[in-house]
C-alpha cells in the first residue's frame, strides 16, 4: 500500500495504522437538467441526439449500399417467407442428409505411381 503525506503527518503514523489513498473519480455526464448550461455538449452533426444509439459513424455519415439487406429480412416471420430447403420434407428423388454437391458416388482409386519414386527405387537395386 502507499502512504500519503497526510498519513505521515500527525500522531496516526506513530500508531502504525494508515489510510489507503483513494483515487478521485471523473465527473459523470448527466442526461437531464444540469446546473450549468456551459457544460451542455451537442453532437458533432448538430442534430439533437436520439435516446437510442442506431449504430454507424456519427462523425462521417455514409449512405447505405444498395446491395445491403435490411434488418427486417433477417427477423421476418418464417410463415411469410418461402420455406428453406433444410426445413421441408425431401422429395423422392432427393436423398435426406446429403449435401447434394456430388450426385455421383465417388469411387476410391489408387494414385498413379510417381516417376521420381520409381527412379529412386531402381537406383537402390
From Swiss-Prot:
Q: Name one GO molecular function term.
A: chromatin binding
Q: Is this entry keyworded Ribonucleoprotein? A: no
Q: Where is this motif: PIP-box?
A: 68-79
Biased composition range(s): Acidic residues = 115-125
Report one GO cellular component.
perinuclear region of cytoplasm
Q: What are the GO BP annotations of this UniProt entry?
A: centrosome cycle; DNA damage response; DNA replication; regulation of cell cycle; response to UV; translesion synthesis
Keyword DNA repair found: yes
- Keyword set, alphabetical order: Cytoplasm, DNA damage, DNA repair, Nucleus
At which positions is motif KEN box? 85-87
Give start-end ranges for motif Initiation motif.
95-107
Q: Where in the cell is it found?
A: Nucleus; Cytoplasm, Perinuclear region
What domain of life? Eukaryota
Motif D-box mapped to chain: 28-39
InterPro entries linked:
PCNA-AF (IPR040444), PCNA-AF_dom (IPR031444)
Subunit structure of this chain's protein: Interacts with pcna.
- Free-text function comment from the UniProt entry: PCNA-binding protein that acts as a regulator of DNA repair during DNA replication. Following DNA damage, the interaction with pcna is disrupted, facilitating the interaction between monoubiquitinated pcna and the translesion DNA synthesis DNA polymerase eta (polh) at stalled replisomes, facilitating the bypass of replication-fork-blocking lesions. Also acts as a regulator of centrosome number.
| Protein name as annotated | PCNA-associated factor
Originating species:
Xenopus tropicalis
